[in-house]
Amino acid sequence: MRIATWNVNSLKARMPRVVDWVARFNPSVLCLQETKMASDAFPHSAFEEMGYESVHNGQGRWNGVAILSNVGLDNVCYGFDDGKPEDPDARIIWATCNGVRVASAYIPNGREVGHEHYHYKLDWLSRLRSHLELNNDPSENLAILGDFNVAPEDRDVWDINSFKGATHVSKPESCLLYTSPSPRDVEESRMPSSA
């Protein structure tokens, strides 16, 4: 199964490119972030014509995440199933695709350390952990894809000195994301060593 992710930063603006890319590479599953459209504006029929089922968690001109699949979409969950109030931001959607639990996630940016948006980001990451602890069977396949807005290692940014004390590289963000119940950074494991 070929699974891909793409922060499209406006699906309306990128739709021709997305259609071309999907036709060229034919992924089994494609996760999209920053669709920036309401749920009722999502082009389900265009993807259906290409052989894809689709689900979308939209929010108008902000955020928005989607999953496209040509191997089935079951058990769709919008947001977190963690017993807390619904998140007003459309930042995550879950579905089971051919036996793999897939999430398309757009983790908050955080703006700056100490800012209310940073605290929202930390809370969001805590909710992700809680959702996984409550709903994820460690023996089942899981793929969380998307725009994580977290760089856990110095080599993950072009100049670590310019990021000192900033969001994306803070210890609390990295600890919440990369010590969660099962995540393993596949991107890192397939990238060639810089040494």
Which residues make up each language-model segment?
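Hydrophobic alpha-helical segments, chiefly the membrane-spanning helices
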Residues: S189-A195
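Extreme N-terminal starter segment of soluble prokaryotic enzymes
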Residues: M1-I3
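Short, acidic/polar
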Residues: K12-V22
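Active-site beta-strand/loop signature of hydrolases that rely on acidic residues for catalysis
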Residues: W6-N7, V22-D40, V102, H131-D154
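Surface-exposed cleft-lining segments at the edges of enzyme active sites
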Residues: I107-L125, F163-G165
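Structured beta-strand-rich core segments of catalytic domains in phosphoester-bond hydrolases
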Residues: T35-A38, F42-E112
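Conserved small/polar residues in nucleotide/adenosyl-binding loops
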Residues: Y178-D185
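Short, surface-exposed, charged loop/turn segments at secondary-structure junctions
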Residues: H119, D154-K171
